[in-house]
Amino acid sequence: MTPEEWTYLMVLLISIPVGFLFKKAGPGLKRWGAAAVGLGLTLFTCGPHSLHSLITILGTWALIQAQPCSCHALALAWTFSYLLFFRALSLLGLPTPTPFTNAVQLLLTLKLVSLASEVQDLHLAQRKEIASGFHKEPTLGLLPEVPSLMETLSYSYCYVGIMTGPFFRYRTYLDWLEQPFPEAVPSLRPLLRRAWPAPLFGLLFLLSSHLFPLEAVREDAFYARPLPTRLFYMIPVFFAFRMRFYVAWIAAECGCIAAGFGAYPVAAKARAGGGPTLQCPPPSSPEIAASLEYDYETIRNIDCYGTDFCVRVRDGMRYWNMTVQWWLAQYIYKSAPFRSYVLRSAWTMLLSAYWHGLHPGYYLSFMTIPLCLAAEGYLESALRRHLSPGGQKAWDWVHWFLKMRAYDYMCMGFVLLSMADTLRYWASIYFWVHFLALACLGLGLVLGGGSPSKRKTPSQATSSQAKEKLREE
């Protein structure tokens, strides 16, 4: 592990005992104590580069104050434009930010765009109420008022997920501050249930990254190896990549769980990133609060089993970095300037690549996803429904195998970063995923498969059952 990885791990582990300290605190101590810890971590790891986060926050707050009815689009433009400046600092002869500064900036961008959207929703709801002339019950998830500058700063610098996620909305943050009877919200048992696989994943990461180092792919000697070896190598590289993020995100979730952050009654049917989808009145007494069943779906960032064993490329995205996937779906996919599912996905993947950075490998990887989505969608629509139950089961196993190989292939661009290294590796295995995806897409079109945006995927309604079948076997 690199020194940076050790620092990330220490930050994640420290957040767990800190969470237990804040869990039963009052709203004021939670707000300002959590912000002080987060600001301290930012200053410690980023130093003077912390100024970038402050500039981004102040700029967003100014836009919210100036144009509350359109601040969402303005905040998106501002924060994404600042990301470009932030990443071009070395080209401008300015000090290059640390990797920790980049991590803080990435999560801060998501939070501020979401905050602007929540403020815009509040402003539009207030205008609608004034126009109608009567008071209505507040909409689920609506903010009670526009946050002040200090409240915006406290949300932005809250230590929870400050470098690794999970992403959370201001409404989720506010619910944590005002959580009734926090002592009734379970933390220790959910934390232990969530944390138990992390040590195993950590050991698997250390073992796989040691046996199959990524740096080997950048050496000339690697390309003298036989084709089967080159093909196989992407599998352990992606495996190590997954194990690394599994550990990081599970630890980050445990930090939230320790603080009771993102806990809602199961009846609220909370979604990762978005929070509750059903209105659930707060408990009126400690006894009622203790009788409720809670979950932490709002801050769930990774479904390890779903990532590894879901059947389709499309589903694989949903189980990975789940809170960020919600953000992308809510603020990018829904407002994409296209109607086609594949084109909307391409637009979303393009902006996701930009959010991650300017390395060409990000774009090569992310822009391969829409091709895979189109290929699996058209071919599945054309063929799978005509198969027998046994044939569909075999189809799903083959589909799962190819889905995993596609992600292995795309991961190489994400970790190699440069265009030269990525294309060199892909060329050494003859761009086989691209060619296979094009062949499947062509076959699906010839056989009359429907567009993914205009049909219901035959396995969509039974995706959970298919996943269970894979689990059983």
Swiss-Prot record:
GO biological process, one term: phosphatidylinositol metabolic process
Its membrane topology: Multi-pass membrane protein
Annotated region (Disordered), positions in chain: 451-473
Keywords: Acyltransferase, Endoplasmic reticulum, Glycoprotein, Lipid biosynthesis, Lipid metabolism, Membrane, Phospholipid biosynthesis, Phospholipid metabolism, Transferase, Transmembrane, Transmembrane helix
Coiled-coil boundaries: none
Keyword Transmembrane helix attached: yes
Record note on disruption phenotype: Knockout mice die within a month and show atrophy of the cerebral cortex and hippocampus. Embryos at 18.5 dpc have a forebrain smaller in size and show disordered cortical lamination and delayed neuronal migration in the cortex. Mice with conditional knockout in hepatocyte develop hepatic steatosis spontaneously, and hepatic fibrosis on high fat diet feeding.
Subcellular location: Endoplasmic reticulum membrane
GO molecular function: lysophospholipid acyltransferase activity; O-acyltransferase activity
Pfam hit, one: MBOAT
Keyword Cell wall biogenesis/degradation: no
One Gene Ontology cellular component annotation held by this UniProt entry: mitochondria-associated endoplasmic reticulum membrane contact site
Segments passing through the bilayer: 6-22, 34-57, 74-93, 195-212, 232-261, 427-447
Catalytic reactions of this protein: a 1-acyl-sn-glycero-3-phospho-(1D-myo-inositol) + an acyl-CoA = a 1,2-diacyl-sn-glycero-3-phospho-(1D-myo-inositol) + CoA; 1-octadecanoyl-sn-glycero-3-phospho-(1D-myo-inositol) + (5Z,8Z,11Z,14Z)-eicosatetraenoyl-CoA = 1-octadecanoyl-2-(5Z,8Z,11Z,14Z-eicosatetraenoyl)-sn-glycero-3-phospho-(1D-myo-inositol) + CoA; a 1-acyl-sn-glycero-3-phospho-(1D-myo-inositol) + (5Z,8Z,11Z,14Z)-eicosatetraenoyl-CoA = a 1-acyl-2-(5Z,8Z,11Z,14Z-eicosatetraenoyl)-sn-glycero-3-phospho-(1D-myo-inositol) + CoA; (5Z,8Z,11Z,14Z)-eicosatetraenoyl-CoA + 1-hexadecanoyl-sn-glycero-3-phosphocholine = 1-hexadecanoyl-2-(5Z,8Z,11Z,14Z-eicosatetraenoyl)-sn-glycero-3-phosphocholine + CoA
Topological domain ranges for the Lumenal compartment: 23-33, 94-194, 262-426
Sugar-modified residues: N321
Stretches assigned to the Cytoplasmic side: 1-5, 58-73, 213-231, 448-473
Record pathway: Lipid metabolism; phospholipid metabolism
Family: Belongs to the membrane-bound acyltransferase family.
Function: Acyltransferase which catalyzes the transfer of an acyl group from an acyl-CoA to a lysophosphatidylinositol (1-acylglycerophosphatidylinositol or LPI) leading to the production of a phosphatidylinositol (1,2-diacyl-sn-glycero-3-phosphoinositol or PI) and participates in the reacylation step of the phospholipid remodeling pathway also known as the Lands cycle. Prefers arachidonoyl-CoA as the acyl donor, thus contributing to the regulation of free levels arachidonic acid in cell.
Subunit-structure text: Interacts with SPTSSA; the interaction facilitates MBOAT7 location to mitochondria-associated membranes (MAMs).
Protein name, UniProt field: Membrane-bound acylglycerophosphatidylinositol O-acyltransferase MBOAT7
Organism: Mus musculus
